[in-house]
UniProtKB/Swiss-Prot annotation:
<dbReference type="InterPro" id="IPR038430">
    <property type="entry name" value="NDAH_ubi_oxred_su3_sf"/>
</dbReference>
<keyword id="KW-1133">Transmembrane helix</keyword>
<keyword id="KW-0618">Plastoquinone</keyword>
<keyword id="KW-0472">Membrane</keyword>
<keyword id="KW-0874">Quinone</keyword>
<keyword id="KW-0793">Thylakoid</keyword>
<keyword id="KW-0812">Transmembrane</keyword>
<dbReference type="GO" id="GO:0009535">
    <property type="term" value="C:chloroplast thylakoid membrane"/>
</dbReference>
<keyword id="KW-0150">Chloroplast</keyword>
<comment type="similarity">
    <text>Belongs to the complex I subunit 3 family.</text>
</comment>
<keyword id="KW-1278">Translocase</keyword>
<keyword id="KW-0934">Plastid</keyword>
<comment type="function">
    <text>NDH shuttles electrons from NAD(P)H:plastoquinone, via FMN and iron-sulfur (Fe-S) centers, to quinones in the photosynthetic chain and possibly in a chloroplast respiratory chain. The immediate electron acceptor for the enzyme in this species is believed to be plastoquinone. Couples the redox reaction to proton translocation, and thus conserves the redox energy in a proton gradient.</text>
</comment>
<keyword id="KW-0520">NAD</keyword>
<comment type="subunit">
    <text>NDH is composed of at least 16 different subunits, 5 of which are encoded in the nucleus.</text>
</comment>
<keyword id="KW-0521">NADP</keyword>
<dbReference type="InterPro" id="IPR000440">
    <property type="entry name" value="NADH_UbQ/plastoQ_OxRdtase_su3"/>
</dbReference>
């Protein structure tokens, strides 16, 4: 039989974790000063007047390498539990994991062939 009180801890945690950010947002809105002057609208750089432009444009190459890192990092996180229980799961899960690994490898080979990973 389904008993609702089995989920009391979950609902309590959900309510508390929802109320705390809402309260923090409301309290900061009440306590924050409303007036905005020229000093408030200026940019801040370690207590001194900023020198040069605040806008620094990064090359797209940095984002490509960061994206490849994130893809393989997330893949590692998903593969770790599979590797820990490899002897219990069987052949079908091995095939699924192989396909899961093969897709990012094919994508990275494609990006490499297109020259997206070249640092020139």
């Amino acid at each position: 039989m389904f008993l609702l009180h089995e989920y009391d801890i979950f609902w309590t945690f959900l309510i508390i974790s929802s109320v705390i950010p809402i309260l923090a947002f409301l309290i900061s809105g009440v306590l924050a000063p409303i007036n905005e002057g020229p000093e408030k609208l200026s940019s801040y750089e370690s207590g001194i007047e900023p020198m040069g432009d605040a806008w620094v444009q990064f090359r797209i190459r940095y984002y490509m390498f960061a994206l490849v890192f994130v893809v393989f990092d997330v893949e590692t996180v998903f593969l770790y539990p599979w590797a820990m229980s490899f002897d219990v799961l069987g052949v079908s899960v091995f095939i699924e994991a192989f396909i899961f690994v093969l897709i990012p490898i094919v994508g990275s080979v494609y990006a490499w062939r297109k020259g997206a990973l070249e640092w020139s």
